[in-house]
Amino acid sequence: MLSYYEHNTAFQTNNCNSGSNAATTYNSDANNDTIMNKRKNDHFEFDTHTFYQRSKRTKRDSVSTKFSVGSGCANLNNNNNNIIINNNNNNNNNNNNHNHNNSNNTATYNNIHYKKNIEICPLKPVSMHHTMNSRLLNESEFYSETEEYMIHGYFGNTNRDITGTSPTGSASIIQHQYHLLPSQSIIASQAPGTAMAALTNNNIANDYMDID
């Protein structure tokens, strides 16, 4: 599992309507090893991870099977797999917060065929233990198609700094956006700015994510 502290792959957007802000933030902060900077980029941390067990692929990516792809690959079937969920802070209705996105499309990554069946399952609401914002947020996580890593997202706060004042976001609505990512080897083969821009393309919600 990757972590921000080991691989510096955490990224965030700030009022982001495209990938530019996330890419700029990532590139400008990539070599900043100060504790405060790491804290800002790891804004939301909760010990509430639950791993959804699914069968693993038998064949893994390798140099011999990998083919060159552009950054647009990160947004394959973007319209089908980026799901915006507006959650009312005062009404955590499981029927509204539980979503499955299943696609029968067959795609090829690294010359390995697989059928896409993306499971997106929000977990129970968790409370931020920061005095600047005590509102409930939902933690969400899901496996990538290649089952090689997970992504976690915490959404709904427009203030980057953990020591800052009250956030400017809506007090009642928390927006979630889920991202479909390519395999780890594809992400690793691209420049950080390119990868981040691709991963955050078409964002309309402020989001903070860790690639674990």
Curated annotation (Swiss-Prot):
Residues 87-105 have a biased composition (Low complexity). It comes from the Eukaryota. GO terms for cellular component: cytoplasm; nucleus. Residues 87-107 are annotated as: Disordered. Present with 656 molecules/cell in log phase SD medium. This is Uncharacterized protein YML053C.
